[in-house]
C-alpha cells in the first residue's frame, strides 16, 4: 500500500486522484448513468454512490467520536461481513440525485476530508490508536483509513469508469 511522508503529500494525492476520477464523469449522460456494461461491476451511478457512502462514513465516524458518541464501524446497521447490504444502502441513499448533484456532493466531501486532514497533527494522522473508530485488530493509523476510502478507490474506480465508457463506445 502506498505511504505518505506527511499530510501535505496525502492531501496532494487525494486532490490529484479525485480530479482524475471526477473528470471521468464528463460525457456520461444522465440517462446512461444506470447502464451496466459487460465486464464492469458497477454502473456510473453505483460507482459514485459507493464513493459518497464511504467518504460520508469516514467523516461521520470522526464527527461522532469528537462528539463523544460511540462509533460502530462500518455502521450500526451493517457489519463488515455484510458489505453488500451496505453498498445497496449507498445506492438507495443517492438514487434520487442526478449525476451532477452527486459530483457536487463528492467534491464537498473531499473538501471536508482535506480540511479535516489539515486540522490533524502528525501523531493523530500517522500513529495507530489515535482514534477509537480506527482502532481495529489491524491497528491502522487514521491516514490509512483515509487512503482506502479516497485515493485507492479513486484510482480503481476511475479505471472502471474508463472501461465502462470503452464498452459503451464513448471513449
Predicted regions and their residues:
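Extreme N-terminal tail/first-helix region
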Residues: 1-20
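Short, contiguous alpha-helical
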Residues: 34-85, 128-171
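Acidic/histidine-rich alpha-helical segments that form the ligand environment
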Residues: 81-126
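Structural signal for well-ordered, non-membrane alpha-helices
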Residues: 18-29, 55-59, 63, 107-121, ...
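Short alpha-helical hairpin
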Residues: 23-31, 126, 130-132
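Acidic/His metal-coordination segments adjacent to aromatic residues that form catalytic metal sites
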Residues: 2-5, 41, 86-100, 136-144
Amino acid at each position: 500500500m502506498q505511504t505518505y511522508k506527511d499530510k501535505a503529500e496525502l492531501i496532494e494525492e487525494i486532490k490529484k486522484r479525485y480530479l482524475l476520477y471526477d473528470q471521468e464523469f464528463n460525457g456520461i449522460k444522465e440517462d446512461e448513468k444506470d447502464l451496466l456494461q459487460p465486464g464492469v461491476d458497477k454502473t456510473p451511478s453505483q460507482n459514485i454512490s459507493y464513493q459518497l457512502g464511504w467518504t460520508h462514513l469516514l467523516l461521520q465516524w470522526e464527527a461522532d467520536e469528537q462528539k463523544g458518541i460511540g462509533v460502530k464501524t462500518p455502521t450500526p446497521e451493517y457489519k463488515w461481513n455484510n458489505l453488500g447490504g451496505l453498498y445497496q444502502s449507498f445506492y438507495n441513499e443517492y438514487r434520487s440525485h442526478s449525476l451532477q448533484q452527486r459530483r457536487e456532493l463528492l467534491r464537498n466531501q473531499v473538501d471536508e476530508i482535506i480540511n479535516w486532514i489539515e486540522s490533524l497533527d502528525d501523531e493523530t494522522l500517522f500513529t495507530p490508536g489515535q482514534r477509537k473508530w480506527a482502532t481495529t485488530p489491524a491497528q491502522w493509523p487514521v491516514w490509512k483509513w483515509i487512503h482506502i476510502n479516497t485515493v485507492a478507490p479513486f484510482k480503481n474506480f476511475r479505471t472502471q469508469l474508463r472501461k465502462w465508457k470503452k464498452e459503451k463506445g464513448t471513449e
